């Protein structure tokens, strides 16, 4: 397997051929401390990796294995799951029982309540029986900038979705400190087509998505409840938001613009920038822009960086927060590697790209 003698932490990747799995393997391949010890899949089992992904060759051209519990537990210290919603929960309880720690890219453990997951992911719930309420309550929501201690001790880390990542990072400092009102929060997000995954979908075809911007799931997008859960837990009150995602004609990148009412309308953009800088001063993956400089998705492509900017409209007392991330890295695989680092006693951003390529 793609190992180097001084790599000491064995990581199995299950669901290796999707976008999340591919990004994870690329980051693990370049990481100085992690060894890719097992590649697993369902539909791709038996295929050679370099045939499936010739653009990302691995040493010794490993075969993607069937998902065999005993082999996974024998060969890994931590398992990174990049499986469709509903499927991760069929494997995770067995891994935890064998004392193997799990980082999960799906939504299966993002909710503290299994019943809430079932109501939001009703289609998946109808296909996959679950009785892992306790694991749902024990899973740590994987925002490393906020939950680093909990992640370091976790048996299972539930990686946030890409929209929640880009929305929560700018919002949480203001909500935590009571600087904004808890009602009337609006989030407008725009994401590239890779956010829809690698499985072919008609609306993601070039002829359908090119030269067009479209809103979708305007009411009831699945990430709405995920964002609300985290904001409510942080504030101690029930928070409802208005969240509208948009599909834009680019492959990768995500931009969220968040609107909230200031409790003190006299606060300036510089005041709000200071709030962000104070909270994230020790977080290499988060960079606060000068007032008047607004983040672009191009600036964060292929990086684990979140660029955040703030402005205040003093006419109406609103703060406007802008956040740009690469949806496949900071919004998915890179954030998972941050959790792997913390679980392994390593610096949070070790082995992760923080400087992009321009243009």
UniProtKB/Swiss-Prot annotation:
Of the GO CC terms on this record, one is: cytoplasm
Instruction: Give the catalytic activity.
Output: N-acetyl-L-glutamate 5-semialdehyde + phosphate + NADP(+) = N-acetyl-L-glutamyl 5-phosphate + NADPH + H(+)
The source's superkingdom equals Bacteria
Give GO BP annotations, semicolon-separated. Answer: L-arginine biosynthetic process
**Where does this chain mainly localize?**
cytoplasm
The annotated pathway is:
Amino-acid biosynthesis; L-arginine biosynthesis; N(2)-acetyl-L-ornithine from L-glutamate: step 3/4
Which locations, inside or outside the cell, does it occupy? Cytoplasm
Active-site residues? 162
Q: One Pfam family, short name please?
A: Semialdhyde_dhC_1
Molecular function (GO) terms listed?
A: N-acetyl-gamma-glutamyl-phosphate reductase activity; NAD binding; NADP+ binding
User: Which Enzyme Commission number(s) are listed?
Assistant: 1.2.1.38
InterPro entries, A to Z:
AGPR_AS (IPR023013), AGPR_type-1 (IPR000706), NAD(P)-bd_dom_sf (IPR036291), NAGSA_dehydrogenase (IPR050085), Semialdehyde_DH_NAD-bd (IPR000534)
User: Of which family is this protein a member?
Assistant: Belongs to the NAGSA dehydrogenase family. Type 1 subfamily.
Q: Which NCBIfam families match?
A: argC
Q: What is this protein called?
A: N-acetyl-gamma-glutamyl-phosphate reductase
Source species: Prochlorococcus marinus (strain SARG / CCMP1375 / SS120)
What gene, per UniProt, encodes this protein? argC
